[in-house]
Every structure is written in C-alpha cells, then in structure tokens.
Amino acid sequence: MNKIKVITVSLLCALSMGAMAQTEKEAKVYTPEVGSSAIGVNFNPVAAAQGGSAASFSSVGQFLYGTETEDGIIKGAEAKPNQMYILSQQPMVSISYKYQAKEHMAFKASIGFSGGYVNYREYVNDDKAMALNPMSEAQVADAVKLDYKGGGITAGLEFNAGKNLRFVGGFGLMYSFGGGEVNFAYGNQITEANQHPTTMEKIDKNINEFASSGCTWMDYGRPVKQYNVGVSHGIGLYVNLGLEWFFMKNASIGATVDLTPIMVAFQPQTYTIYEGYDKYHGAVAQYNDLVSPGSTYLLYGTENIGVNISLHYYF
C-alpha cells in the first residue's frame, strides 16, 4: 500500500507540473539538440520507503537499526525472506548521464552506491575483576563491527516524444549488489575456568545462533565472524515510462515508473564462525557453521516496481 501511495503521489505531482507548463500561453520551447549531454540526480522513494540499503542484507544490520522491545529483542533482527528483491530496485539516490544521439533517442546511464563501517560498542562486566572482587565495578567493552556496501549501475536507451512536456520511456540493463560481513570483538576471553564469559546482551539475544548450529563438542559458543549473505549480485532488465518537463532552458525535472521484470541474483557462501571451549581437547577452538555453499535466484514479475524522480541539466 505504501508503494502505491508513493507512486501515485509522484506521478500526480509530475502531471500537475506538466499541465501548468502547457497552459502557459507564452511558454518558450526548450528541447535538447542532437549531440548534447545531460547530467542529473535521481531519487527512488520506493527504495527509501522499503529501507532498501545494503545494511538490510545483514541480520546485524537489522539489529543495529531496529527497534528494541520490552524484552530486549530487536524488531527486524531476523533475516527477511524477500530481501533479495532489494536488488531489483534502482538505488535510492543515483547520478545519471544522458547523450542525445537522435532527436527522439538518447543513451542513458546511472550509478548509485552506499556503504559504511559501523563499530558498535557496549560495556560489560569484567569477569576477571569480578572473580577477584565480587564488588568490583570494572568493565570491558564488546564490539560489533559491521562492514557493508551496496549500489547499482544501469545502462540503456531512452525515447521521447513532445516538447516542453515530454513523454519518455526506455529500457536497458541493470547491475546491482549489496551486503557485507560482520566481525565481533570481546572484552572477556573464553578460558577453561570461564567457558561462558559475560557478553553483550544484545549479541546473545539477537545475533548468537550457536544453539541451532549443530556443534556437539562445545557447550557454548559465540560468533567471531558472520558472513551472513555476503555481497550478493544481480543482473536484470529494466523498463520505464514517465514524463519530463523543461521548466527552464537546459533544465528539466521528471518522474518515471521503473519496472524490473526479470533479474538473476547470486548469493555467495554463507557461514558463521563461533569460538568456544572444546570440552574434548581442553582448549579454546573455533567452529565454522557453514549455512550455504551459495544460491541462485530468478526474480521475475510486475511487482518489482519503483519510481525515479529526477533533475537534469543539459549542455
């Protein structure tokens, strides 16, 4: 429903602006000449409404940006089954380039990306100090280090008809990617005497899935690295239809409905590395919980829809 509202409002705004422009009796006509170029900025409100960022590909990303409930659980911490459809959306914000090859045809390309590194830290009790002095208030820090990236590139043809207010439509190829990895650092170390050290509560409640990993030689484990989805890639076909209005010489605003009817997506190997105390060998060890060797997705349909609101300058 939110997607429909965003699309409807965007197109109505574009249509109203175009209608006002066409009713101006003495309006001048500005159209790009063959051989001219344009640079612009595009905004996709559907991607913004869906939270379609690279962080969405990680359950830790959901943990960092989610909302805590009364029981301490973060809403949205679980992976979303439809998260691969984020790849079928053009970036939330992108930069585009046009080259007017013919009077009613132009080559168009765009690129948009996002990324970041988050080092989220919290204090926990210092177990060693507490063992020596139960009244100790000493603390150490745990950290969740999230490295994520994402973006998209499009290249295709755009056709137009009209003057000041133009009908535009086109098609082309889209490549998109998103994801990352998560690393953990702990202030309290695992030892023979302290096999279940105090750890950031949010890690144990929202991230640690050791209980379902199937490891039998560790009674407790905590994650040290989570390659949860990793960087996934998608290649697809896009088509769009919309309007472009030249509100002044060499400058235009536009709105298009974008559709990605088909896309092939690739998800790399997925795994989590845990550390714990090996009760059979009497030493701290790591366990690699391999979740998936990699997956392939075929996304198709008319629901992979978005909107692009653009501002271009021709020269």
PLM region spans:
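Gram-negative (and chloroplast) outer-membrane scaffold detector with strong preference
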Residues: 93-222, 230, 234-237, 245-251, ...
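Outer-membrane beta-barrel domain signature
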Residues: 28, 82-86, 142-146, 160, ...
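Extracytoplasmic loops and strand-loop junctions of Gram-negative outer membrane beta-barrel proteins
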Residues: 72-81, 134-141, 216-227, 288-295
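Outer-membrane beta-barrel proteins
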Residues: 48-54, 117-122, 178-184, 264-273
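Predominantly the C-terminal beta-signal and adjacent terminal strand-loop region
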Residues: 242-315
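Charged, glycine/proline-rich intrinsically disordered loops and linkers
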Residues: 64-74, 197-218, 278-287
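Cleavable N-terminal export/targeting peptides
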Residues: 1-36
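Short glycine/proline- and aromatic-enriched beta-strand/turn motifs that initiate or cap beta-hairpins
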Residues: 22-110, 114, 120, 299-315
